[in-house]
A protein has these predicted regions:
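Generic alpha-helical secondary structure signal
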Residues: 155, 186, 235-236, 279
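Short, charged, solvent-exposed linker or helix-capping segments at domain edges/interfaces
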Residues: 64-65, 121-130, 205-209, 288-292
Length: 292
């Protein structure tokens, strides 16, 4: 079972899903057996969804997907096949793209797709290229904040994530004779998340990145924050508390203005104090560059 996006199988795929949903209308009437108390669904048309989980192995490919979702109409050509028996193709909207980058694990990419045209069956089999991939470590993908015109990473980070969501609406009309449904994009949103150990700057000269105290002050002041999420590669600091140089990032994935919508801290006995912050984007973000 494999999912292809724009003619290529999703690299590093670990799981893919396909769902076909029938849209029905209740045709129950008083003259039915049982005096019309039993549902009598009649098929109207169908909708379909696909999903894929994979390791992040190609930063350039990830950036291309982000450009399609953020700068474009989020539509892609998809092909789904199961062995030699099932082969379906169609046009779909990426309704959610999520990148998770936890420390000590591989970075992962999750895609949710919603069909925006009817499916075409018997589309022919596509070759699945077999190749060994090198998944990117979660540690190599970081979130940074602009402070005094310079981007700084968050101190003692343990995980970061990026989520782009797309809202759709059905546009199927009486003129459409197909059994499937048509959809279009009506809205988009982006969010970022960081999870960290609570760290303290013991002296003004100590370099530890953005701390919980600094975040708390910014949230209470209602500041709009400039954030950037990207791939550092081997340039990331060896210690979790290092304040890595954002300019050394090999690839900036997204950047823009954000507001912190949730800041929470947890101080359990016998465990490290931790905090997490969630950010919602203000307007359209940039792909591949930082905003000053």
């Amino acid at each position: 079972m494999n999912l292809f996006v724009d003619g290529a199988v999703v690299a590093g795929s670990t799981s893919c899903t396909f769902t076909l949903s029938a849209n029905t209308a209740d045709a129950a009437s008083k003259t039915d057996l049982g005096d019309g108390m039993w549902d009598n669904p009649e098929f109207q048309n169908y909708g379909w969804q696909m999903g894929n989980e994979s390791f992040v192995a190609n930063v350039a490919g990830l950036q291309t997907l982000l450009q399609k979702v953020i700068n474009g109409n989020a539509e892609v050509d998809v092909h789904f096949q199961v062995g030699d028996d099932v082969s379906m193709s169609g046009r779909a909207i990426i309704t959610q793209l999520q990148v998770s980058a936890p420390n000590g694990e591989k970075a992962t990419l999750s895609l949710s797709l919603e069909g925006c045209t009817p499916l075409s069956g018997n589309a022919g089999q596509m070759d699945v290229a077999k190749a060994k991939i090198s998944p990117i470590k979660g540690k190599a993908m970081m979130l940074a904040m602009q402070v005094s015109n310079t981007y700084h990473t968050f101190a003692a980070s343990t995980s970061h994530s990026l989520t782009v969501s797309v809202q759709t609406a059905e546009t199927t009309t009486k003129d459409d004779n197909d059994m499937g449904t048509y959809k279009e994009v009506t809205g988009k949103s982006i969010s970022l998340n960081t999870e960290n150990l609570v760290s303290v700057k013991n002296s003004p000269s100590q370099v530890t990145g953005i701390t919980f105290a600094e975040m708390l002050a910014k949230v209470m002041a209602g500041e709009t924050l400039k954030l950037a999420f990207g791939y550092y590669g081997s340039s990331i600091g060896a210690e979790a508390g290092d304040d890595a140089d954002w300019n050394a990032a090999e690839t900036v994935l997204v950047s823009g203005d954000f507001v912190c919508t949730n800041l929470s801290a947890n101080g359990a006995n016998k465990e490290n104090a931790t905090y997490s912050a969630e950010f919602s984007g203000k307007g359209m973000p940039s792909v591949g560059e930082t905003e000053n």
